[in-house]
Amino acid sequence: MTIGIVGRKTGMTRVFTDDGVSIPVTVIEVEPNRVTQVKTADTDGYSAVQITVGERRASRVTKSEAGHFAKANVEAGRSVWELRNNSQEAFEVGASLTVEAFSAGQFIDVTGTSKGKGYAGTVKRWNFGMQDATHGNSRSHRVPGSTGQCQSPGRVFKNKKMTGHMGAERVTVQNLEIVRVDAERNLLLVKGAIPGAPGGDVIVRPAVKARTNA
């Protein structure tokens, strides 16, 4: 059992069961996660574990970051992540978290950054219905239409669905099943799709709303 781990989405493939059933899976590469700081309720007001992954050139590490990594006696990673620790499990600075913390058949939640789609209209962004293709409609086929009333209330309500930037948001997909754990190659094979493009960092946690295969 673990509080979570940081990996990198590498792409999708499929695996076959003994019965010949094809299962689409996402491959997550998980380099050893190095613990850089352990936060406790006494010192920080809450319990959490700060980790780093990968490596970064020394010229790209700020002095404050270099001091932080040196204090933990770990190599500077490409970034730092923080995972809340609500369990009784104890972690030590400098320790490594690997894929062996998970097991096949376990359900997980995966958090990542969705693909950016740029500036999008309401039809694409919010699945609005289109207006008439003909019958007097010449240039308003994909226009959202009215955004509110007139004098009362005389404004557009907050959170009105309109055109704007689509994607590039933090997204969490819940209750994905781990099909296989490859400890030799540091890989997790997860059933289904996860957020983001290949090469993006993702956070893998035990499922909050865990379910069983029964």
From Swiss-Prot:
Domain of life per record: Bacteria
Residue numbers of N5-methylglutamine PTMs: Q151
Disulfide bonds: none
InterPro entries: Ribosomal_uL3 (IPR000597), Ribosomal_uL3_bac/org-type (IPR019927), Ribosomal_uL3_CS (IPR019926), Transl_B-barrel_sf (IPR009000)
GO CC field: cytosolic large ribosomal subunit
Biological process per Gene Ontology, one example term: translation
UniProt modification remark: Methylated by PrmB.
Renumbered residue ranges of the record's region Disordered: 133-155
Pfam families: Ribosomal_L3 (PF00297)
Keywords linked to the UniProt accession: Methylation, Ribonucleoprotein, Ribosomal protein, RNA-binding, rRNA-binding
A GO MF term: rRNA binding
Quaternary structure, from the entry: Part of the 50S ribosomal subunit. Forms a cluster with proteins L14 and L19.
Assigned protein family: Belongs to the universal ribosomal protein uL3 family.
Protein's job: One of the primary rRNA binding proteins, it binds directly near the 3'-end of the 23S rRNA, where it nucleates assembly of the 50S subunit.
Name under which the protein is recorded: Large ribosomal subunit protein uL3
Species, as recorded: Cellvibrio japonicus (strain Ueda107) (Pseudomonas fluorescens subsp. cellulosa)
Biological classification of the source: Bacteria, Pseudomonadati, Pseudomonadota, Gammaproteobacteria, Cellvibrionales
